Amino acid sequence: MAFVLSEEQQMLRDSARSFADERLPISQLRVLRAKGEGFDGTTWREMAELGFIGVLIPEEFGGSAFGYIGLGQVLEAQGRTIAASPLLSTALIGASAFVIAGSQAQKETYLPQIASGDLIMALAVDEGPHHDPSHISLTATKSAGGYTLSGDKRYVVDGVEAGLLIVAARTSGGESDANGITLFLVQGDAKGVSRTPLKTLDAHAAVGGAPLLDRRGLQFARSCARNHRWHFGGDIPHIRA
């Protein structure tokens, strides 16, 4: 099967490559790494103005609706320069979650914020050293006003700067049961969320954390020997997606 880009897709590809070469060179990654920063906010805003962040988002929510082929051109362009940006976690994973599974209210609230570059997202799934989305032990139990999430997540890409998290939590079943997993929306600054930056080979911004909740969901501070994790605890209202 022949794969040929449309004229508009070719223009998007060329624009994305030019931008990545000029504004997201590998030298920028080295500077950010030296500063301990995950990405440059000014460059991210420029990406939003050029429409790169809203490629998957319908026009009614501020995007350009170029689809996955279009976004693929932007991702490929940034991959060529090892660009430091939360494009994958926000423009692909975050936007897809709302476009595919979000309620109308969630789309109206979050998609415009993603397209404008105002909202950075992160997906918190893995809990062990390897990717295994069915192995979830972080629990979500019903409580007054919503749910209480308690547990740890590892290697949350772009989690350092994320304002909104998509968290996979277990609402039923056993630890390795493929069923009984629910996705929750959690504000990055929610009470009970603790983040610890991780050093990665490509200097990309990922996080871990430390537990701050006991079994009853009441906050207290305690030390923990486990590193490279992200802990969630506290009552999370309005959130199942």
Residue ranges, per PLM feature:
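Short Gly/Pro-enriched turn/cap motifs at secondary-structure boundaries
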Residues: 87, 128-131, 155-158, 174-175, ...
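A short, Trp-centered hydrophobic/proline-enriched beta-strand micro-motif
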Residues: 117-128
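Glycine-rich beta->alpha junctions and the first turn(s) of the following alpha-helix
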Residues: 2-14, 80, 193-241
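A short core secondary-structure module
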Residues: 150-194
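Internal helix-loop-helix
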Residues: 49-108, 112-117, 157-164
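Buried hydrophobic positions in well-ordered alpha/beta secondary-structure cores of metabolic enzymes
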Residues: 9, 20, 51, 58, ...
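Short secondary-structure junction/hinge motifs that connect adjacent elements
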Residues: 27-49
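A structural signal for short hydrophobic beta-strand segments in well-ordered beta-sheet cores
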Residues: 138-141
